[in-house]
UniProtKB/Swiss-Prot annotation:
EC number: 2.5.1.16
This protein's record includes keyword Iron-sulfur: no
Reactions performed catalytically: S-adenosyl 3-(methylsulfanyl)propylamine + putrescine = S-methyl-5'-thioadenosine + spermidine + H(+)
Family to which this protein belongs: Belongs to the spermidine/spermine synthase family.
Name of this protein: Polyamine aminopropyltransferase
Localization annotation: Cytoplasm
Length: 312
Protein backbone atom coordinates (compact mmCIF):
# COMPACT_ATOMS: atom_id res chain seq x y z
CA UNK A 1 0.00 0.00 0.00
CA UNK A 2 1.45 3.35 -1.00
CA UNK A 3 1.91 6.09 1.58
CA UNK A 4 -0.14 9.31 1.37
CA UNK A 5 1.41 11.95 -0.85
CA UNK A 6 3.36 14.45 1.29
CA UNK A 7 3.30 17.35 -1.16
CA UNK A 8 1.00 19.25 -3.50
CA UNK A 9 1.55 21.06 -6.78
CA UNK A 10 1.55 24.84 -7.09
CA UNK A 11 1.08 26.09 -10.64
CA UNK A 12 2.53 29.32 -12.01
CA UNK A 13 1.13 30.59 -15.30
CA UNK A 14 3.42 32.40 -17.75
CA UNK A 15 0.79 32.79 -20.45
CA UNK A 16 -2.88 31.71 -20.50
CA UNK A 17 -1.66 28.49 -22.18
CA UNK A 18 1.57 27.72 -20.32
CA UNK A 19 2.45 27.02 -16.72
CA UNK A 20 5.00 25.28 -14.57
CA UNK A 21 4.24 23.27 -11.46
CA UNK A 22 6.39 23.13 -8.34
CA UNK A 23 6.00 20.67 -5.49
CA UNK A 24 5.33 22.33 -2.13
CA UNK A 25 5.99 20.18 0.92
CA UNK A 26 5.11 22.64 3.68
CA UNK A 27 3.37 26.01 3.94
CA UNK A 28 5.22 28.38 6.26
CA UNK A 29 3.01 31.44 5.82
CA UNK A 30 -0.01 32.33 3.72
CA UNK A 31 -2.15 35.43 3.73
CA UNK A 32 -3.99 37.92 1.59
CA UNK A 33 -2.69 41.35 2.52
CA UNK A 34 -4.35 44.61 1.45
CA UNK A 35 -1.96 44.60 -1.52
CA UNK A 36 -1.35 41.03 -2.69
CA UNK A 37 -1.59 37.31 -2.03
CA UNK A 38 1.51 35.89 -0.32
CA UNK A 39 2.79 32.36 0.10
CA UNK A 40 6.04 31.33 1.79
CA UNK A 41 6.64 27.62 1.49
CA UNK A 42 9.16 24.83 1.48
CA UNK A 43 9.47 23.22 -1.94
CA UNK A 44 10.64 19.78 -2.93
CA UNK A 45 13.68 20.86 -4.96
CA UNK A 46 14.27 24.62 -4.55
CA UNK A 47 14.28 25.09 -0.78
CA UNK A 48 12.14 27.82 0.71
CA UNK A 49 10.39 30.22 -1.62
CA UNK A 50 8.30 33.40 -1.71
CA UNK A 51 5.33 33.61 -4.06
CA UNK A 52 3.31 36.80 -4.62
CA UNK A 53 0.08 36.89 -6.62
CA UNK A 54 0.79 33.46 -8.03
CA UNK A 55 4.37 34.16 -9.16
CA UNK A 56 7.53 32.87 -7.51
CA UNK A 57 9.74 35.80 -6.49
CA UNK A 58 12.74 33.80 -5.28
CA UNK A 59 13.80 30.49 -3.78
CA UNK A 60 16.74 29.79 -1.51
CA UNK A 61 18.46 27.43 -3.98
CA UNK A 62 19.01 29.92 -6.81
CA UNK A 63 18.11 33.40 -5.49
CA UNK A 64 21.79 34.39 -5.57
CA UNK A 65 21.61 34.47 -9.37
CA UNK A 66 18.87 37.10 -9.25
CA UNK A 67 20.07 39.22 -6.35
CA UNK A 68 23.73 39.41 -7.39
CA UNK A 69 22.64 40.36 -10.92
CA UNK A 70 20.32 43.05 -9.58
CA UNK A 71 22.79 44.71 -7.22
CA UNK A 72 26.38 44.51 -8.37
CA UNK A 73 26.24 45.87 -11.95
CA UNK A 74 24.85 49.17 -10.63
CA UNK A 75 27.41 49.39 -7.84
CA UNK A 76 30.23 48.70 -10.29
CA UNK A 77 28.83 51.32 -12.69
CA UNK A 78 29.04 54.02 -10.02
CA UNK A 79 32.68 53.18 -9.33
CA UNK A 80 33.51 53.17 -13.04
CA UNK A 81 31.87 56.61 -13.36
CA UNK A 82 34.19 57.93 -10.65
CA UNK A 83 31.73 57.82 -7.77
CA UNK A 84 31.51 55.94 -4.49
CA UNK A 85 28.33 53.98 -3.68
CA UNK A 86 27.59 55.26 -0.19
CA UNK A 87 23.81 55.68 -0.15
CA UNK A 88 21.57 53.03 -1.67
CA UNK A 89 17.78 52.99 -2.01
CA UNK A 90 16.04 49.63 -2.44
CA UNK A 91 12.46 49.62 -3.71
CA UNK A 92 10.73 46.41 -2.73
CA UNK A 93 13.02 43.57 -1.73
CA UNK A 94 10.95 42.09 1.08
CA UNK A 95 13.13 38.97 1.37
CA UNK A 96 16.11 41.09 2.49
CA UNK A 97 18.45 39.40 0.00
CA UNK A 98 18.95 42.63 -1.95
CA UNK A 99 19.98 44.27 1.32
CA UNK A 100 22.40 41.40 1.90
CA UNK A 101 24.14 42.01 -1.41
CA UNK A 102 24.31 45.79 -0.98
CA UNK A 103 25.85 45.39 2.47
CA UNK A 104 28.79 43.49 0.98
CA UNK A 105 30.13 46.84 -0.25
CA UNK A 106 32.44 48.43 2.31
CA UNK A 107 31.72 51.94 1.04
CA UNK A 108 27.99 51.70 1.87
CA UNK A 109 26.97 53.99 4.72
CA UNK A 110 23.17 53.94 4.40
CA UNK A 111 20.61 51.60 2.84
CA UNK A 112 16.92 52.46 2.88
CA UNK A 113 14.48 49.75 1.84
CA UNK A 114 10.99 50.96 0.91
CA UNK A 115 8.26 48.33 0.61
CA UNK A 116 4.53 48.93 0.47
CA UNK A 117 3.58 45.68 2.20
CA UNK A 118 4.70 45.44 5.80
CA UNK A 119 3.02 42.06 6.26
CA UNK A 120 5.15 40.47 3.55
CA UNK A 121 8.33 42.06 4.94
CA UNK A 122 7.56 40.75 8.43
CA UNK A 123 6.82 37.26 7.13
CA UNK A 124 10.06 37.15 5.12
CA UNK A 125 12.01 38.40 8.09
CA UNK A 126 10.61 35.54 10.16
CA UNK A 127 10.65 32.68 7.68
CA UNK A 128 13.50 33.44 5.24
CA UNK A 129 16.64 34.01 7.36
CA UNK A 130 18.63 32.06 4.76
CA UNK A 131 18.01 34.93 2.37
CA UNK A 132 18.39 38.05 4.50
CA UNK A 133 21.14 36.63 6.74
CA UNK A 134 20.42 39.19 9.44
CA UNK A 135 20.59 42.18 7.09
CA UNK A 136 17.54 43.82 8.65
CA UNK A 137 19.53 44.21 11.89
CA UNK A 138 22.50 45.96 10.28
CA UNK A 139 22.76 49.53 11.67
CA UNK A 140 23.16 50.92 8.15
CA UNK A 141 19.70 49.64 7.18
CA UNK A 142 16.40 51.49 7.52
CA UNK A 143 13.15 49.82 6.49
CA UNK A 144 10.29 52.13 5.49
CA UNK A 145 6.81 50.72 4.93
CA UNK A 146 5.41 53.11 2.34
CA UNK A 147 4.50 53.58 -1.30
CA UNK A 148 7.69 54.05 -3.33
CA UNK A 149 6.20 56.94 -5.32
CA UNK A 150 5.33 58.81 -2.14
CA UNK A 151 8.78 58.18 -0.69
CA UNK A 152 10.55 59.41 -3.82
CA UNK A 153 8.55 62.62 -3.85
CA UNK A 154 9.76 63.40 -0.34
CA UNK A 155 13.42 62.37 -0.56
CA UNK A 156 16.23 64.48 -1.99
CA UNK A 157 18.73 63.80 -4.80
CA UNK A 158 21.10 62.00 -2.45
CA UNK A 159 21.21 58.44 -3.79
CA UNK A 160 24.23 56.87 -5.44
CA UNK A 161 22.33 53.71 -6.40
CA UNK A 162 18.61 52.94 -6.64
CA UNK A 163 17.53 49.31 -7.06
CA UNK A 164 14.02 48.37 -8.12
CA UNK A 165 13.35 44.89 -6.71
CA UNK A 166 9.61 44.87 -7.33
CA UNK A 167 7.04 42.24 -8.13
CA UNK A 168 5.85 42.03 -11.73
CA UNK A 169 3.70 44.97 -12.93
CA UNK A 170 0.35 43.20 -13.16
CA UNK A 171 -2.68 45.48 -13.26
CA UNK A 172 -4.15 44.18 -10.00
CA UNK A 173 -0.83 44.35 -8.14
CA UNK A 174 0.81 47.20 -6.24
CA UNK A 175 3.78 47.80 -8.57
CA UNK A 176 2.48 48.62 -12.05
CA UNK A 177 2.95 52.40 -11.66
CA UNK A 178 6.61 51.85 -10.82
CA UNK A 179 7.48 50.83 -14.39
CA UNK A 180 6.32 54.05 -16.06
CA UNK A 181 8.07 57.03 -17.61
CA UNK A 182 6.83 59.30 -14.85
CA UNK A 183 8.33 57.06 -12.20
CA UNK A 184 11.65 56.74 -14.01
CA UNK A 185 11.86 60.53 -14.19
CA UNK A 186 11.42 60.64 -10.43
CA UNK A 187 14.20 58.08 -10.10
CA UNK A 188 16.56 60.11 -12.29
CA UNK A 189 15.89 63.26 -10.28
CA UNK A 190 16.85 61.53 -7.02
CA UNK A 191 20.18 60.11 -8.20
CA UNK A 192 23.57 61.72 -7.86
CA UNK A 193 25.03 62.77 -11.26
CA UNK A 194 27.21 59.63 -11.36
CA UNK A 195 24.48 57.42 -9.90
CA UNK A 196 22.95 54.26 -11.35
CA UNK A 197 19.55 52.59 -11.37
CA UNK A 198 18.77 48.91 -11.94
CA UNK A 199 15.32 47.41 -12.42
CA UNK A 200 14.03 43.87 -12.75
CA UNK A 201 12.61 44.17 -16.25
CA UNK A 202 10.52 41.12 -17.01
CA UNK A 203 11.08 37.88 -18.93
CA UNK A 204 13.08 37.87 -22.16
CA UNK A 205 11.95 34.60 -23.75
CA UNK A 206 10.61 34.94 -27.31
CA UNK A 207 6.97 34.37 -26.29
CA UNK A 208 6.83 36.99 -23.55
CA UNK A 209 9.55 39.57 -24.14
CA UNK A 210 7.23 42.52 -24.90
CA UNK A 211 7.26 43.70 -21.28
CA UNK A 212 11.06 43.74 -21.21
CA UNK A 213 11.40 45.62 -24.50
CA UNK A 214 8.86 48.22 -23.38
CA UNK A 215 10.56 48.77 -20.03
CA UNK A 216 13.89 49.26 -21.81
CA UNK A 217 12.27 51.58 -24.37
CA UNK A 218 10.69 53.61 -21.55
CA UNK A 219 14.00 53.90 -19.70
CA UNK A 220 15.69 55.16 -22.87
CA UNK A 221 13.30 58.13 -22.96
CA UNK A 222 14.59 59.17 -19.52
CA UNK A 223 18.23 58.10 -19.12
CA UNK A 224 21.22 58.78 -21.37
CA UNK A 225 22.52 55.21 -21.13
CA UNK A 226 20.60 51.94 -20.72
CA UNK A 227 22.13 48.45 -20.69
CA UNK A 228 19.71 45.50 -20.82
CA UNK A 229 20.83 42.06 -19.68
CA UNK A 230 19.29 38.78 -18.58
CA UNK A 231 19.92 35.77 -16.38
CA UNK A 232 18.57 32.26 -16.36
CA UNK A 233 17.42 31.01 -12.95
CA UNK A 234 15.38 27.78 -12.88
CA UNK A 235 12.92 29.26 -10.38
CA UNK A 236 11.56 31.57 -13.09
CA UNK A 237 11.22 28.91 -15.77
CA UNK A 238 12.98 31.02 -18.40
CA UNK A 239 15.33 33.99 -18.88
CA UNK A 240 14.61 37.05 -16.75
CA UNK A 241 15.65 40.53 -17.82
CA UNK A 242 17.15 43.52 -16.05
CA UNK A 243 18.06 47.00 -17.18
CA UNK A 244 20.86 49.21 -15.86
CA UNK A 245 20.36 52.95 -16.44
CA UNK A 246 22.62 55.95 -15.83
CA UNK A 247 23.50 59.37 -17.16
CA UNK A 248 27.16 58.39 -17.58
CA UNK A 249 28.15 55.99 -20.37
CA UNK A 250 27.82 52.27 -19.65
CA UNK A 251 30.40 50.09 -21.37
CA UNK A 252 28.72 47.13 -23.12
CA UNK A 253 32.08 45.33 -23.05
CA UNK A 254 33.49 45.80 -19.55
CA UNK A 255 37.05 44.59 -18.99
CA UNK A 256 36.85 41.47 -16.80
CA UNK A 257 40.15 42.20 -15.03
CA UNK A 258 39.01 45.71 -14.15
CA UNK A 259 35.68 44.44 -12.81
CA UNK A 260 37.43 41.79 -10.72
CA UNK A 261 39.75 44.45 -9.30
CA UNK A 262 36.81 46.68 -8.34
CA UNK A 263 35.02 43.79 -6.64
CA UNK A 264 38.18 42.72 -4.81
CA UNK A 265 38.79 46.23 -3.51
CA UNK A 266 35.20 47.10 -2.65
CA UNK A 267 33.61 43.94 -1.21
CA UNK A 268 33.92 42.94 2.43
CA UNK A 269 35.65 39.52 2.46
CA UNK A 270 34.07 38.68 5.80
CA UNK A 271 30.69 38.49 4.06
CA UNK A 272 31.83 35.69 1.77
CA UNK A 273 32.59 35.52 -1.93
CA UNK A 274 30.08 36.20 -4.67
CA UNK A 275 28.71 33.03 -6.25
CA UNK A 276 27.68 34.43 -9.64
CA UNK A 277 28.99 37.86 -10.59
CA UNK A 278 32.60 38.41 -11.59
CA UNK A 279 34.30 40.17 -14.48
CA UNK A 280 33.79 37.45 -17.07
CA UNK A 281 30.18 36.92 -16.03
CA UNK A 282 29.37 40.64 -16.28
CA UNK A 283 30.94 40.81 -19.75
CA UNK A 284 28.80 37.86 -20.80
CA UNK A 285 25.60 39.30 -19.35
CA UNK A 286 25.96 42.49 -21.36
CA UNK A 287 26.14 40.60 -24.69
CA UNK A 288 22.45 40.78 -25.57
CA UNK A 289 21.26 38.11 -28.05
CA UNK A 290 20.43 39.23 -31.58
CA UNK A 291 16.69 38.52 -31.38
CA UNK A 292 16.41 40.63 -28.24
CA UNK A 293 18.50 43.48 -29.66
CA UNK A 294 16.21 43.58 -32.70
CA UNK A 295 13.08 43.53 -30.54
CA UNK A 296 14.36 46.37 -28.37
CA UNK A 297 15.32 48.43 -31.43
CA UNK A 298 11.87 47.93 -32.96
CA UNK A 299 9.89 48.69 -29.79
CA UNK A 300 7.76 51.86 -29.86
CA UNK A 301 5.56 51.51 -26.76
CA UNK A 302 6.43 53.71 -23.79
CA UNK A 303 4.82 52.92 -20.44
CA UNK A 304 3.13 55.93 -18.82
CA UNK A 305 0.52 56.38 -16.12
CA UNK A 306 -2.03 56.73 -18.93
CA UNK A 307 -0.60 53.68 -20.73
CA UNK A 308 0.69 51.39 -17.96
CA UNK A 309 1.82 47.77 -18.26
CA UNK A 310 -1.05 45.39 -18.93
CA UNK A 311 -1.43 41.63 -18.99
CA UNK A 312 -1.41 40.42 -22.61
Amino acid sequence: MSSPRSFFWVQEYFTPWDYTARAVTRILAYRKTPFQEMLIAETGAFGKGLMLDGHWQSTTVDEFLYHEALVHPAMVQVVQAGGIPRRVLVLGGAEGATLREVLRWRSVEQVVMVDIDGEVVAACREHLPEMHQGSFEDPRVEVVIADALDFLQETGPIWDVILSDLSDPIESGPAYRLFTQEFFRQIRSKLQPDGAFTIQAGPTGPVELHQHTRIVRTLKTVFAAVQPYAIYAPTYGGPLGFALAAQDPISPRPEPEQIDQILSQQLDPERGALQFIDGITLLGLYQVPAHLRRAIAAETVVYTLDNPPRIE
